[in-house]
Structures are given as structure tokens and as C-alpha cells.
Amino acid sequence: MSRIAVLGSGAWGTAIALALSRRGGHQIFLWSHSQEEASTIAGARENTLFLPGFLLPASIHVTANPNPIAQAEMVVSVVPSEFLRPTIARLQAYFRPGQVVVSATKGIEHASCLRMTQVIASALDVLPPAPTAPNPDTCLEVFTEPDAPEVSSSGIEAAPTFLDRLDLDFGALSGPSFALEVAQGQPTALTVAFQNPAVAARVQQEFASETLRLYTSTDVVGVELGGALKNVIAIAAGVAAGAGLGYNSAAALMTRGIAEITRLAVACGGQRETLAGLSGVGDLVLTCTGSLSRNRTVGQALGQGRKLPEILASLGGKVAEGVLTARAALELARRHQIEMPITEQMELILNEGKDPREAIKDLMLRPGKDER
């Protein structure tokens, strides 16, 4: 029996736990940062706050105790991007050598421009500390080789710490997947990416069921950036819908949106083909058109003239990752000298209060370009 810890008891974390339970043969620990929340879910055997209507089977153990993390062969992180670093730092002592760590959060850390697998590695001291403020000159988009081991005056290497010995595999799970539909058991296909294809194949097998199919990849960069950046384009699609624009506009935004996502992903080391798959075009189409998309919902409300603080408050504690991703994505694009006009206009709407209709007009009046 495999022991799997799911970090984050929101809608997506709960849906992943339910999907894993359908596979059978797993002991699943759904970890919450809040003892009160964990007790409520465990008592009701249902996540009444974030994903009501689904009974949690006996194979899912809901807890706020971090000890089960140390017992797990696989850790699936579904913690929202803005809380990921402090959460992993808090749980650092419970990670152990040989674990497989899967990030299922779609975002980019605002302060560092790091992808989610990089944030986890950084919080575990595998990467250098992140900077405290966004800066295109200090955004880190690649892993850095660790420093050479310290050597004492006697010439003997210093004894390794726990984290020096920590040998973890980091990967990403992404693709078109509304939590509600995954929880309902509707057929869903996702991509799981690890640099080591054998580890990706292992995760694929652990998740596989008649309702969930995983495809493997070694392109962690492309899979993560596709999942994160499409949220910004989904906000743009919502803005267009809220402003009363039609299908022509939506098609243009999605097509040009995947073009700018691909440019940045390739510049960061991703593969163009990845963005044509489930974690790129697939996720983009779903999030830009589906009524269950929180990012599209936020954009639609903005297009109707509502203010961002009011919109976010109406989400009932759920997170629209694109709101936080826009600025970090733009900083990363500036570092790599990549044009991302849609992302730029969304950042101005979200963070500078630009009128959505002015943003749409400015996109249309940009100088003529070749289609690439």
C-alpha cells in the first residue's frame, strides 16, 4: 500500500485525494494548515467549505498533524502559491530522503519569479533564498548548483546536515482540470513532468484510474509555466466577456495568449511542444471558456466594472492564481526580453486600476507584427 500526503485541503487538494482514493491501494493523508478546518472535514467526512457534496472514503485521513508527511512515499503539494514558501519551511523537518514531491499548484512566486517546484526546493534549502521584492535582475528561473561541501582545517569534509542528505525528486502535475469535475469522477487527462522519466512513470501509475489518465513528460519548466501563465490569459478572456465582446475576441485572446506563453516558456528552457499539449493549450482552453474558472470569473467581473478587492472577497476564500501571477510573469518576461502584451495589459488592470476597455483598445492598436 502506497502512503501519499496531499498538502492543502482546499477544493483542488480534496479533489486530488478523492481521485487517488479511486485508484485503490493508497493510504492518503489530506493535510490542512488549520486544526479547526481538519477537525471539521474529518468530522463531517466532507469538505463542506471548499468542495461540498462529496463523501470522503475511509482511505482518506484528514489531519493537521504533520507527522504523516514523514511516513509518505509521495507528497503532493496543492498549497496556494502565496502561502507555499512559509508552509514548506514550516514542514521542512518532515520531508525525508527518497520521497517523490509533486507540485499541483499553478503559479509563480511574486517575490522571486520562481516556479512552484523551485519554491519547494528553495524552502527546503536546496536553492538559494529568494529575494524579498520582485526584480527582473534577481528573478531566478533555473536551479543553481549547490556549493561545494565545507572542509575543516584537518581536511575532512564537515558532516552533512539532514538537508544535505535530502535526495528528493521534484515534479509538476498540470492540465485541464476543474476540481469539481475531478471530484465527480468525470474523465480527466493531465500531464506529470519529472526530469527523471522513471519517476514520472511511477507517479503516472499511482494516479491512474478509469477517471484519471496521466501523460508523462520530462519538461518540468514547460508544464509549470503553461499551467501558471494560462491563468492570466483566462482573466483576459473574462474581461472580454464581461465587456460584452464576442467569440472573435475570445478566439484572438486564446490564440495570441498561447503564443506569448510559449515564447516565455521556451526562453526559460521549456519545450514548444509541451505548450501544444494538455498543460498548455488544453488547460488554456478550459480556463478561458469554462464557467467554473475562478480566473475567468474575476476577469468577467472586472470587465463589468467591478473593483478587484470586492471581486476577490466574493470568492469565499478560494484563490484565483492569475491575479498574483500577472506581475511575476511580466517581471520574468522583462528579464528574458520577451513581449507579453496581453499579460502586460492584465497587470495594468489588476495592479494599476487601468480601465479594461482602454486595455483592449491598446492591444488592438499595437504596431503591426508578423504572426509568430
Task: Identify what each model region corresponds to.
Residues 1-54, 61-64, 90, 139, ...:
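NAD(P)+-binding Rossmann beta1-loop-alpha1 motif at the extreme N-terminus of oxidoreductases
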Residues 10, 14, 22, 31, ...:
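Electropositive phosphate-/nucleotide-binding environments in soluble metabolic enzymes
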Residues 56, 62, 67-70, 74-77, ...:
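Rossmann-like NAD(P)(H) cofactor-binding subdomain of soluble oxidoreductases
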Residues 94, 119, 124-131, 160-169, ...:
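Internal alpha-helical scaffold of NAD(P)-dependent oxidoreductase catalytic cores
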Residues 103, 169-174, 214-218, 276-277, ...:
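General beta-strand structural signal in soluble alpha/beta enzymes
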Residues 230, 237-241, 266-276, 280, ...:
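NAD(P)-dependent Rossmann-like dehydrogenase/reductase catalytic/cofactor-binding core
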